[in-house]
Curated annotation (Swiss-Prot):
It is a multi-pass membrane protein. It catalyses: a plastoquinone + NADH + (n+1) H(+)(in) = a plastoquinol + NAD(+) + n H(+)(out); a plastoquinone + NADPH + (n+1) H(+)(in) = a plastoquinol + NADP(+) + n H(+)(out). Its EC number is 7.1.1.-. One of its GO terms (cellular component) is chloroplast thylakoid membrane. Its main location: plastid. Keywords: Chloroplast, Membrane, NAD, NADP, Plastid, Plastoquinone, Quinone, Thylakoid, Translocase, Transmembrane, Transmembrane helix. It comes from the Eukaryota. Pfam families: Proton_antipo_M. GO terms for molecular function: NADH dehydrogenase (ubiquinone) activity; ubiquinone binding. The chain crosses the membrane at residues 4-24, 35-55, 87-107, 113-130, 134-154, 167-187, 211-231, 242-262, 272-292, 305-325, 330-350, 386-406, 416-436, 466-486. It is an enzyme of class 7 (translocase). This is NAD(P)H-quinone oxidoreductase chain 4, chloroplastic. GO terms for biological process: ATP synthesis coupled electron transport; electron transport coupled proton transport. The gene is ndhD.
Length: 500
């Protein structure tokens, strides 16, 4: 057990510092913005320092563990810890949240509440990734939903209340299944009920019970990931949310579902996961081609990017379902990779909206000459999204492909069929991404409109774009930077399976 509460400080600091902002006298929007940015930078530096000096990459066990009795009556503990599976997502959360708050500089209405909600969401997300207690994981999972709902309903487009209501109905409804799974898995014990994830990982269950628990957790995580057909909240939410909120949704929130699938479904319920993995493989494959074929029909810019996120999440599901070392490593790399790519694309879509106040691709055109910096960055990040060699998406998808090929669980014809359908999806991806760029930046529609003034990317926007792009290129050139963090944990998880 760790004697200094590093993780507790990292989890509690953002929401605590954000709460102070609500009670301090109003000093103007700029003060609140810079205060929030300083909090995020300090949090990111503290997280990086803690992990650099206290995390051992060759140890697959839980590190920096903290275990404090919280509620005696319920035998409830505040258990935190990290391993190779969670360290990457925690660092991703810190990086994307800092960029999202910097991107939210134009927000002036209810600035104090807006930035407090962003910080509360930050704490909930880090708490979910570092929880080593099932009930604490559930509480953090729910804590993160409240700020998202308020951010959607108060700052967004004309249909923001509809999209916020749809979001909360889907996620709150799925949380019921998560709670049932948490109670079921914790109450069944050989000696006494436990919520400790480390102890639960070494526990076996009757096959029927394991299947029931697996389905409950799967529904909860399938909504958040999202998996088809439980994805319909995502395009509406992204289409109406402020682009800084979209950055957090695409960059972090979707990854929580994939993280839960690995942390709970795959690690705690290996027999059920082995039984359900072929179905997950089918769903992931269909998801890639479904989203890639549906996306070109979306006339709303942000909805089209949202469908690209659905397609990319299909690769993560396939990697998890492959039950192989390369497949799971590729899925983890894709989680980090798409976190940066998705957040960056939504940011650039938002900066375009700030200039022209349009989201319909049919009304756009001809912006490349007036805003060459934004055009260049959007083109590069579109290439990253379609998995151009040299970018992180290419490496992640290639490793997932390799994981399918080397899997001993599936027959040769099944693997050939899966790879063939995935390849079709990858061919469709450039069609909807490049056509999106063509509709936005080429042609003469907006150039011929009078009283339209364009201004190119400013220093803040250019810094945000470059900050998102550099990790994408870095992981594309040297993916071992991410893979080395999780490799030992992946081997530990796969040791519960008889093939791989």
């Amino acid at each position: 057990m760790n004697y200094f509460p590093w993780l507790t400080i990292i989890v509690v600091f953002p929401i605590s510092a954000g709460s102070l902002m609500l009670f301090l006298p109003y000093r103007g929007n700029k003060v609140h913005k810079w205060y929030t940015i300083c909090i995020c930078i300090l949090e990111l530096l503290l997280t990086t320092y803690t992990f650099c000096y206290n995390f051992k990459m060759n140890d697959p066990l839980i590190q920096l563990s903290e275990d404090y009795k919280w509620i005696n009556f319920l035998d409830f503990y505040w258990r935190l810890g990290i391993d190779g599976l969670s360290i990457g997502t925690i660092l991703l959360t810190g990086f994307i949240t800092t960029l999202a708050i910097l991107a939210a500089f134009p927000v002036t209405r209810d600035s104090r509440l807006f930035h407090f909600l962003m910080l509360a969401m930050y704490s909930g997300q880090i708490g979910s990734f570092s929880s080593q207690d099932l009930l604490l994981f559930f509480i953090m999972w729910e804590l993160e939903l409240i700020p998202v709902y308020l951010l959607l309903s108060m700052w967004g487009g004309k249909k923001r209340l509809y999209s916020a209501t749809k979001f909360i109905l889907y996620t709150a409804g799925s949380s019921i299944f998560l709670l049932i799974g948490v109670l079921g898995i914790s109450l069944y014990g050989s000696n006494e009920p436990t919520l400790n994830l480390e102890l639960l990982a070494n526990q076996s269950y009757p096959v029927t019970l394991e299947i029931i628990l697996y389905i409950g957790f799967l529904i909860a995580f399938a909504v958040k990931s999202p998996l088809i057909p439980l994805h319909t909240w995502l395009p509406d939410t992204h289409g109406e949310a402020h682009y800084s909120t979209c950055m957090l949704l695409a960059g972090i929130l979707l990854k929580m579902g994939a993280y839960g699938l690995v942390r709970i479904n795959m690690e705690l319920l290996p027999h059920a996961h082995s039984m359900f993995s072929p179905w997950l493989m089918v769903v992931g494959t269909i998801q890639i081609i479904y989203a890639a074929s549906t996306s070109p029909g979306q006339r709303n810019l942000k909805k089209r990017i949202a469908y690209s996120s659905v397609s990319h999440m299909g690769f993560i599901i396939i990697g998890i379902a492959s039950i192989t070392d390369p497949g799971l490593n590729g899925a983890i790399l894709q989680i980090i990779s798409h976190g940066f790519i998705g957040a960056a694309l939504f940011f650039l879509a938002g900066t375009s909206y700030d200039r022209i106040r349009l989201v319909s691709l049919d009304e756009m055109g001809g912006m490349a000459i007036s805003i060459p910096k934004i055009f260049t960055m959007f083109t590069i990040l579109s290439m990253a999204s379609l998995a151009l060699p040299g970018m992180s998406g290419f490496v992640a998808e290639f490793i997932v492909f390799f994981g399918i090929i080397t899997s001993q669980k599936y027959l040769l014809m099944a693997k050939i069929l899966i790879i063939f359908v995935m390849a079709i999806g990858m061919i469709l991806t450039p069609i909807y991404l490049l056509s999106m760029s063509r509709q936005m930046f080429y042609g003469y529609k907006l150039i011929n409109v009078q009283n339209f003034s364009f201004f190119d990317s400013g220093p803040r926007e250019f810094f945000l774009s470059i900050s998102s792009l550099l990790p994408i290129i870095g992981m594309g050139i040297y993916p071992d930077f991410v893979l080395a963090l999780a490799s030992n944990k992946v081997e530990s998880i796969l040791s519960n399976y008889f093939y791989g």
